Amino acid sequence: MQLSFRWYGDSDPVTLKQIKQIPDMKHIVSAIYDVPVGDVWTKDKINALKSSIEQEGLTLSVMESLPVHESIKLGEANRDNLIENYKKSLRNLGESGIKTVCYNFMPVFDWTRSNLDYELEDGSKTLMYDNDFVKDIDPVTTNLNLPGWDESYTKEEMATLIEKYRQFDEEDLWKNLEYFLNAVLPIAIEHDIDLTIHPDDPPWSIFGIPRIIKTKESYQRLIAINSSKNNGICFCTGSLGCLEENDLPEIIKEFGDHIHFVHMRNIKRLDNHSFVESGHLSKYGSVDMKAVVRALKDINYKGTIRPDHGRMIWGETGKAGYGLFDRALGATYINGLIEGVETNDTTIS
């Protein structure tokens, strides 16, 4: 198990020099952020990013995310051209030495929260999802923008997309995911790229739009499309942990051959599908983080783990969920869990 850290490139207020001072931190998760969704990621851009990271003594190990264009998810007439571009990007990544690529198949909204500055009892600020608040919002008719909404869309473009997806059910979305995977997985397999799908965040339908990657049954259906290990999973404890029915260690054990990337964060489940993102320690949330790491050890997981969202602590400001301080604390906690399970120390929790 190897620690990694999300870095948003030169515009990120968290620097590579700071990241490499985190104990045992050697790997970076990043992406090409200045290319429009659907265009090709060139080798020049990929290798320039790699070089900037390697100059600081770190390794670019995961690309998160290589985004899937909405027209592919919708199955529109131009999807084949967009899929060809996706395949070219995958080839360029593989030929540049990138072997793990994360993506998602969430319609319109990659993730949604109702509050980025929810104050916990200790005074730290965190991300929060209030389901009672969100369920009464219609993005088509309201002027409100919630955290996680793609601001590259105009109000009119977003409304059009949402109305298209409201004509969909889960079967329609599954059909389009299968079409996409049947097209791109041969390229991933050829270049030994583990293509890892991130679960929906949160893992249920919002705004009348279907979501499909949310439970054990979702992964069973995913693997049924193609059983290759390259048809992979990004295992996110925070997203999957929002549903109490998801037994995270059991999911890890069932799908271990397909898990190639792990996001570790804790959440505190509240009533009626609401939740707050807590500190990483097990006792602060609803996810048994030690049980997750032990399950990863049991499947002999050798891939990367990144401390996912952190709280804003000690007066830090910046991109919500992606400050330095609490994610660094999360990394050291994960280090301790790994050391504990590898030495069978039952006192670690």
UniProtKB/Swiss-Prot annotation:
Its EC number is 4.2.1.8. One of its GO terms (molecular function) is ferrous iron binding. The gene is uxuA. InterPro entries: Man_deHydtase, Xyl_isomerase-like_sf. It comes from Oceanobacillus iheyensis (strain DSM 14371 / CIP 107618 / JCM 11309 / KCTC 3954 / HTE831). Its cofactor is Fe(2+); Mn(2+). It is an enzyme of class 4 (lyase). This is Mannonate dehydratase. It catalyses: D-mannonate = 2-dehydro-3-deoxy-D-gluconate + H2O. Belongs to the mannonate dehydratase family. Gene3D superfamilies: Divalent-metal-dependent TIM barrel enzymes. Keywords: Iron, Lyase, Manganese. Catalyzes the dehydration of D-mannonate.
